[in-house]
Amino acid sequence: MTVSTVPFLALSAVGAFATAPAWAADEPRAAPPMSGADGSDVDDAQRSDILVNGVRDKRADVAKAVAPLVNTPRSVVVLPKEVIDQTGSTTLEDALRTVPGITFGAAEGGNPIGDRPFIRGFDSQGSIYVDGVRDLASQTREVFATDSIQIVRGSDSTLGGRGSAGGSLNIVTKKPELDNFGSVQASFGNADYKRVVADVNLQLSDMAAFRVEGLWHDQDIAGRDALYSRRWGVAPSVTIGLGTPTRLTASYYYLESHALPDSGIPYLYTLGNAPGTGEVHTGPAIGTVTTAGGQTGFVDRSNFYGLASRDFRDATTNQAQLRVEHDFGGLTLRNTARYTHNDQSYIFTLPDDSQGNVYGTTATNSGGALTSGGYVWRRANTRYGYSESLIDQTDLFGTFSTGSIDHSIAVGTEFAWEKSRRGTLNVSSGFGNSPRCTTATLARDNCTSLFTPNPADPWVNYASDTSSVVAPIVRNPGFAEIQNDARTQSVYGFDSITLTPRLILNLGLRFDRFTSIAQAGVATADTPRTRIERTDNLVNWQAGLVFKPTPETSVYASYATAATPPNALLGEGREDNNTIIGGRDPATLTVDSLKVQKTRSYEVGAKASLFGERLSLGLAGFQTDIRNARVIDANQNVSFIGENRIRGVEFSVNGQ
C-alpha cells in the first residue's frame, strides 16, 4: 500500500508545518491557565500534569483520570494518533489489534454488525466512550477524527457506570489548537484500495480556533470476491476562549457507510448434522473437501456465498457536542452535553452450516431435498434500527492540598436518556424448507454450490417461500419492532491522594440509578404490547495503592467493581441478561430473576515510563470474580451458572 502525506500551511502563515504532538491538548486543566498548547512556558507547579516535552497530559480530556498513567493503579494503555497512523489503522478494530488482551467478535449469536471488543475475555461492546461520554450504538467506528484511544482493563463501572467486567475504551477526538496547520494523506493499495484523510486547523484569533477533519474511503476486500466498503465523513469543531479561564467548544461528527458485508466461509459439519462422523465440530470448509455423498472439490478462501444484488449494509452516525469549561483557583468546572443519532440497516448472508447441506445429511429425501452435501444455504440475516441518546455530564476537577497531603480530585454528575428501536426486513430466503437446500431453493438462488458460488446470481425476492409473486424488500410492520428506553442519573467522585512522594492512594465511588423499559414486538397492530420496566440502583467503587521506587516506576495493587443490569445494552447487542431475548414476548421471562450481574476485579502490577516517557512498560496479574453469571442456552433461555472466575497475566509495551 502506498501512503502519501501532503502538509501545508493554513492562512498563508509563515513557518514550518506543524503537527499536534502526542498527548497534546488545547485547553488547560486548571487555573492559572496553562499555555503549553501554544508554545509558551509552563511553570514548575504545573509540571506534574505534563507527559512529553512540555505538552499537556491527555488525561485532561477525561476528568475522572486524576493521575498520570504511571501513577494509576490499573492496567491502562493509550494509543496516540502517531501509532494509529503508523499502523495504517482505519477503524477502531484495526487500531486495537496492536493491544494485548483485546479480541473482536463479529455479528454471531444474534449480535448486530458493529464493534464488539472483548477485553480480558468479556464482551465490552457497551463500554465504549467518546471523550468520556458513553457511545452505545452498534456501529463500525472510524479513526479519521481520533487523537488517541484509551483502554482501561478490569471492572470499570466506577468510571462509566453500568459496564462489563473486562474494561472500557475511550476515544479522544481531535480538537482545535492555537496554530495554523493542515495535512492531506492519500493511501492506495491492492484490491482497489483508496483513502483520503484531511486535517486542517485554523487560528481565528488569539483565543479562537477552528478545526475540521474529512474522510473519503473506497475499497474492495483483498482476497474476497465481490465485497466492498465505502464511507465518507466530516468532523468540524470550533473553540472560543483558548488560553483563557473560560472555554467553549462546539463539535459535530458525521459518518456515512455503505458496504457489502461478509460473514465468511461455512463450517463443514457439526455433531447435530453429520451423524456417524463422531465429530462434535470441524474447521471451516476450505481447501479440498469431500462430502458425505462422495463429491470432492476445492473451496477457495475467496469464495463469497452472499448475493451482490440483495446484501447490503448502510449506516450513518450524527453526533453533536457542546462543552463549556471554566477555571477558578486550582479547579476546573466542565459541562459536556451530547446528542447522538445512529441508523443502521443491513442484509447479510450467513453461509449456513447448521442444516447438513454442506457436508450432507441422512434426512429423508422429501420435497426434492439435496442430502448428499456440497451446498450452502444463503441464510439472510436482516436488521434495521436506530438509537438515540442525550447525555449531560458535569465535572469538577483539579488539585489542592490538605497540610502535607496532595489531592487530585474529580467529582461529577451524569444524566442520560437513551433509546433504541430495531426490526427486520421482509426477505424470502427458503427458511420454511428443512433441510434448507432443496431443488426449489436452489432454483431461487437461496442455496448455492459449496465449490463454485456465484455472487451475481439473479436472486429475486418473493412474497413467501411458496409464492411466485415478486415482492419488494421492505421493513416489517412497526408493531413488530423491539423498543428499548433507558434513563440514568449518576453521581461520582475520585481522589488520587499523594500521602508521600513514594506512596499514592487512589479512591473512587459511583452511584447510578438505571431505569430501563423494554417492549417486545407484537403480531398485529391491535395486539397490546407487554411493557417491562425496572430500576436498578448500582453502587460501585475502586481502591488502589501505588508505591513508587523511582519517579518513573510504580508498583500497585487495586480492587474495582462492575455491575451489568438487565437490558444494559438496550438491544444494541446480544446480552446473556437481556430483558428481551430475540423478539419473543418478555412476559415469558421472570423479571425478578434477572439479577444484576456483579463483578470484582483484583489486580497487582508494575509500570515503568522510560526514555523521556516515550516508552511505557506494564506487567499485571489479575483475577475477576463474577456473581449472578448467566448464559443463553440452546433453547434461547437464560441459564444461571452462579459464579465464575477468570485469572490472567498481561505484559504490554507502548511507545512512540
Regions found by a protein language model. Give the residues of each.
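Outer-membrane beta-barrel translocator/receptor signature
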Residues: 144-147, 158-236, 242-247, 318, ...
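Membrane-embedded beta-barrel scaffold of Gram-negative outer-membrane proteins
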Residues: 325-327, 331-338, 342-348, 556, ...
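Face-selective signature of the C-terminal outer-membrane beta-barrel domain
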Residues: 322-340, 379-519
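Periplasmic plug
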Residues: 76-81, 86, 98, 108-155
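Structural signature of Gram-negative outer-membrane beta-barrels, strongest in the C-terminal barrel
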Residues: 241, 387, 406-418, 425, ...
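Acidic/polar loop-and-plug regions of large Gram-negative outer-membrane beta-barrel proteins
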Residues: 217-222, 234-241, 245-325, 343-387, ...
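Transmembrane beta-strands of outer-membrane beta-barrel pores
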Residues: 186-192, 216-220, 254-258, 328-330, ...
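N-terminal Sec signal peptide and the immediately downstream disordered periplasmic leader
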Residues: 1-89, 93-99, 655
